[in-house]
Amino acid sequence: MSFDTMLIIISLLLLAGGVGKRTLDRSGVSRRAGVSFFIVLAALSHFKLSLSDGVRISPACITAAVWPLVFAFRKRAACRAPQLILPLAALCGITASALMPYVGGEGGALFASVLTSAAAGALAGLPFGLAFSGSFTLFLITAGGVAEALESGIMFLELTNGALACQLAGMLAVCSCALIKQTLRTSVRTYSDERTVK
């Protein structure tokens, strides 16, 4: 069984079980927004803006960096510096795409875009779950074979690989947040019990 076939089967099973919708909702990204982002990214990945000295700017990289933080404006009251969200994200995308020749091509540049976007969210003061869970979803979209599939030009495999990676990333984000919350609760409970004993 080929890798792509395995991804297709697992993705269909996860979608049939409704896992994708639940994990995307929990990670702060709606299904419609996720699908829209992926289609836009797939289209933009075929375009490059060539600058001097062989430097190329990728619209897909800029989109990958900006999109995870756009929905953060819904929660801007919880952010210490909401005015920094989009400028930081755009800067991350431009920087990552300019570094494309040095980070393994488009796949590496998209990977770097989403990673730096999460860091930008943290710098702008977004809460942990808001800044990183949505970005984790996109992080594994690129790591899940999207860049390789784009090079092959097979849209069905692009969408399948991306859907699977998105679901797995959503599960990872949800589990990570749940683990952190549980750890914090346990620590607080233990500390409280110790004080009670004393």
Model-based region annotation:
Residues 1-21, 125-198:
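C-terminal transmembrane helix-loop-helix hairpin of multi-pass membrane proteins
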Residues 10-16, 38-44, 65-70, 89-96, ...:
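Hydrophobic core of alpha-helical transmembrane segments in multi-pass integral membrane proteins
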Residues 24-30, 51-57, 75-85:
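Interfacial helix-loop-helix linkers and transmembrane-helix boundary segments
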Residues 31-55:
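A generic, lipid-embedded transmembrane alpha helix
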Residues 39-47, 91-99, 137-149:
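Aromatic-anchored segments of alpha-helical transmembrane domains
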Residues 60-62, 66-67, 72-140:
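Membrane-proximal helix-loop-helix units in multi-pass membrane proteins
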